[in-house]
């Protein structure tokens, strides 16, 4: 029983991360990365230099990621003519699975990228959050907003208590910056 309660406590901590203040990340400059899309195209973050970039870290089995996907498409449709790009980075899954379960299922108009080893996702993980977990796991269902200068202006980590399914906070920050 004690083991069960301990595991329950640890798992609830893992899924109750708070959204970090935007101020915590304003000095963080994102390093360029290069990943293949589900269509086989190589996509570099540098390709979006001069644009705002919304990045969502996902997996096909993550229920929070799946719920947010249609809202990411809405953000893309609303903002792509306003110098804003949207990307999903899927962590450690096959191209065929991701294409079917994310790109096609949600009819996404923007690139879905494959982070086969989780290295890019892990590079965004704050070092002070759940240090015992793999860095790429911490970033699942997270959203980032990178400004045209390559600096993080918004980061939300999964918070099941205050889950922002419609991405209201992300859109609010994007509107402030535009």
What does each model-found stretch correspond to?
Residues 102-140:
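Short, internal strand/loop/helix patches
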Residues 138-178:
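Thiol-/selenol-based redox modules, centered on thioredoxin-like
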Residues 44-66:
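Short active-site neighborhood of thiol/selenol oxidoreductases, capturing the structured segment around
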Residues 46, 124, 154-156:
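Short hydrophobic alpha-helix segments
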Residues 17-45:
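N-terminal "domain-start" segment that seeds a small globular fold
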Residues 30-31, 52-53, 140-142:
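Short loop/turn microsegments at loop-to-beta-strand junctions
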Residues 3-13:
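Sec-dependent N-terminal signal peptides
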Residues 67-108, 119-123:
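Structural microenvironment flanking redox-active thiols in thiol-disulfide oxidoreductases
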